[in-house]
Swiss-Prot record:
Top-level taxonomy: Eukaryota, Metazoa, Chordata, Craniata, Vertebrata
Record GO cellular component, one term: extracellular region
Record field: transmembrane: none
Main localisation: secreted
Signal peptide segment: none
Additional facts recorded: Negative results: has no proteolytic activity against dimethyl casein and fibrinogen.
Modification after translation: N-Glycosylated.
Quaternary structure note: Monomer.
Tissues where this protein is expressed: Expressed by the venom gland.
Enzyme class: hydrolase
Protein name per UniProt: Snake venom serine protease
Task performed by this protein: Snake venom serine protease that catalyzes the hydrolysis of arginine esters, kallikrein substrates Pro-Phe-Arg-MCA and Z-Phe-Arg-MCA. Cleaves kininogen analogs to release bradykinin. Induces contraction of the isolated rat uterus directly at high concentrations, but provokes more forceful contractions when injected in presence of bovine plasma. Shows capillary permeability-increasing activity and hypotensive activity on the anesthetized rat.
Species for this entry: Crotalus viridis viridis (Prairie rattlesnake)
Length: 30
C-alpha cells in the first residue's frame, strides 16, 4: 500500500507496522 519515498515516515511508519509488518520495511524505517 505504502512504499518508498511516498511513505511519510513520521506517521505511516507505525501505522504500517501495525497493519502490515512487511509494509513498514518499505515505509522507510530502515
Amino acid at each position: 500500500v505504502i512504499g518508498g519515498d511516498e511513505c511519510n515516515i513520521n506517521e505511516h511508519r507505525f501505522l504500517v507496522a501495525l497493519y502490515d509488518p512487511d509494509g513498514f520495511l518499505s515505509g522507510g524505517i530502515l
